[in-house]
From Swiss-Prot:
Lineage: Eukaryota, Metazoa, Chordata, Craniata, Vertebrata
Domain free text: There are two conserved domains in the glycosyltransferase region: the N-terminal domain (domain A, also called GT1 motif), which is probably involved in manganese coordination and substrate binding and the C-terminal domain (domain B, also called Gal/GalNAc-T motif), which is probably involved in catalytic reaction and UDP-Gal binding.
GO cellular component: Golgi apparatus; Golgi membrane
Gene behind the chain: Galnt10
InterPro entries: GalNAc-T, Glyco_trans_2-like, Nucleotide-diphossugar_trans, Ricin_B-like_lectins, Ricin_B_lectin
The protein's name in its UniProt record: Polypeptide N-acetylgalactosaminyltransferase 10
Region spans: Catalytic subdomain B: 311-373
Keywords: Disulfide bond, Glycoprotein, Glycosyltransferase, Golgi apparatus, Lectin, Manganese, Membrane, Metal-binding, Signal-anchor, Transferase, Transmembrane, Transmembrane helix
Enzyme Commission number(s) from the entry: 2.4.1.41
Amino acid sequence: MRRKEKRLLQAVALALAALVLLPNVGLWALYRERQPDGSPGGSGAAVAPEAIQELHSRQKKTLFLGAEQRLKDWHNKEAIRRDAQRVGNGEQGKPYPMTDAERVDQAYRENGFNIYVSDKISLNRSLPDIRHPNCNSKLYLETLPNTSIIIPFHNEGWSSLLRTVHSVLNRSPPELVAEIVLVDDFSDREHLKKPLEDYMALFPSVRILRTKKREGLIRTRMLGASAATGDVITFLDSHCEANVNWLPPLLDRIARNRKTIVCPMIDVIDHDDFRYETQAGDAMRGAFDWEMYYKRIPIPPELQKADPSDPFESPVMAGGLFAVDRKWFWELGGYDPGLEIWGGEQYEISFKVWMCGGRMEDIPCSRVGHIYRKYVPYKVPAGVSLARNLKRVAEVWMDEYAEYIYQRRPEYRHLSAGDVVAQKKLRGSLNCKSFKWFMTKIAWDLPKFYPPVEPPAAAWGEIRNVGTGLCTDTKHGTLGSPLRLETCIRGRGEAAWNSMQVFTFTWREDIRPGDPQHTKKFCFDAVSHTSPVTLYDCHSMKGNQLWKYRKDKTLYHPVSGSCMDCSESDHRIFMNTCNPSSLTQQWLFEHTNSTVLENFNRN
């Protein structure tokens, strides 16, 4: 009998030990699972070891907040099933089959996208679930804060605005939506007045605010935020479509750390046919170049997660789609009230949150589609300058790094940024860190793609073809059109020295119009061994835009395994099978840097 009692006591002791140890083992396993792949001894550690250590510290702080709360599957399975059965124009995010009559310019004139097509697609259309498969099984905190969803608009199309609202209502748990606040920035279209009021009266959670004069996007957002009652403020644009289970992943991160700003993955809704698809490269970190253009850069190996559906840190947000704890937003001062209309605000809020004690993440399991307009369909008030906004952000937040912007944009030096005393005082009261800290701890991978000091170019000037004596020219081309040969103009006096025949073979191994100090954002691009050479948006990811200028004067294109060639008869420039003895495949740059070229061609 005593032996049985002894065994029973041993079993109880083991059970108690398990109760003590297992939660810690589980948390350790969870912690290990969330570590970046880069090991302390790997190549990434040599890049920015302190930044990686600080990242680990930030992850641990976020991990344990709310760890003991109950979790829940927030998916609306019934709604997902119904959506899967929908058929019709644009359903499942498929392109609308357009006719020539539907492509007319008038369709785009008022909105910057094809409103005729938008009007023919259901307000409740289904979207493809293009999240990572792991998102389907993710659980989030059972108790989440609610949110006020702020949607500013100015002269927005009827169907595109309503589809935005419908998508939010259809794909958001009702208990998480405190309200949807539509903020009208002084629209003058009749359908956005009483007809909109009458329609939105059908939805108790929707209310409309209106400005008394044209305020611009930034102040309109601020008006909506000041009226918000939810625990969290979520900003959307007025031509978006929220995808499946988009909201809980955002609110979960804020519930675990109230000083986290979270951004959904922004998918592309085509402005022509309204097809729904991911952005090129999908999950990438937000960044900028030193002219303050927004850029996207790959997630470095040091930051990649074992589970690609997990949230990841991003230095800079894309713009108007994000969620933030309401009280934290106002502790940060909201948007700088001195910023005019639009532009630069995403940098201001990004720098501010990182430097002043917060963090920012992109959430792969939250996806929202956005129509990228063909062009901006309205004029902003006279005297408003994007440059002024960027100068203001640089003066308040970028410290000595602002000089790199002024070197590239000398016209910014003497531009008035307005009174920034209050903003600098706010920065001081929040005990914000320096911009150098931001660049070394948060955006440490940015200089690899966009160095503050531009490395020397490999070659520049005119590109003259040996066989024809003609020069590469862009004057007849628009973005996406083929390059052409034209009579060389360099020798006709300094007045003829212009960017139409001036190119730079940059340190990125791409070729861009312009001299080394003033290159444009377009690159030589080729897709196959017989394709024309076109100008395309530079992506700095090599691929179709990678070139090698070889000692035999050929411009070799590694992706297609071919060389740039030309035709004297019709002045075409195209790719062809490499033939070093062919004079039409030999090209002379006006200036070359032999050291840089040797480094390029070393392998």
